[in-house]
Amino acid sequence: MRLDYALFNQHLANSREKAKALVLKNRVLVNKIVISKPSFIVKEGDQIELIATNPFVSRAGEKLGAFLENHFIDFKEKVVLDVGASKGGFSQVALLKGAKRVLCVDVGKMQLDEGLKNDQRIECYEECDIRGFKTPEKIDLVLCDVSFISLYCILEAIVPLSGEFLALFKPQFEVGRAAKRNKKGVVMDKEAILNALENFKNHLKTKDFQILTIQESLVKGKNGNVEFFIHFKRA
């Protein structure tokens, strides 16, 4: 049976049109994975659930979720490393998109959402600096969302771990102290932001990376800082 029909038949939507709209808005899970095609065939025994209007455990999840609405990255059956996992926003989205397992690394402790921490697909490494992290695991994709440190400082540590990367570039930690900021620490110097982004892009190229996408995050940082997703892989 089609997913939109199943939603209507199970009284999860008031009409087939509303059921279709829910699917297209990525608000429907089948067996814990987001399905975005109304014509997806549901089998007997499949578990269908609706996602709340804001299902994310953190702002990071909102950022990545919004990015992936316009930029496809294949997570299905992949082993993902989440660097700077914190509450687990990126990890949550990875699982919703079909990741097989997610390794969560963060220098902090007791931050990861309890629901994620209890998920068997999650491996939690607390009080762990990525620069000292080692694993025999083959990592298919590295997600990176770190604060209070430049991406330059950890790039050499994450490069050997995988061949594909999606990093959140945060100008507030990249432009240096001389850049003009407001009282909340938001960088106001647009030229400094663009220069810092260009410099990092050029740095990746010197390291023989192919840049697939650079996109301003549709969801800004907590205090209003502009941030950028950079998707890159080994050339």
Annotate the PLM regions:
Residues 76-86:
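Conserved class I S-adenosyl-L-methionine
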Residues 152-166:
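A short glycine-rich, Lys/Arg-flanked "PGG" loop and its adjoining helix->strand segment in the class I
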Residues 172-215:
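C-terminal substrate-binding/active-site "lid" region of AdoMet-derived donor-dependent transferases
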Residues 103-151:
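S-adenosyl-L-methionine
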Residues 1-46, 79:
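A basic, amphipathic helix-loop patch mediating RNA/tRNA/ribosome contacts
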Residues 87-98:
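Conserved SAM-binding loop of SAM-dependent methyltransferases across substrates and taxa
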Residues 162-176:
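Conserved beta-strand signature within the Rossmann-like core of class I S-adenosyl-L-methionine
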Residues 216-235:
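Core SAM-dependent methyltransferase catalytic element
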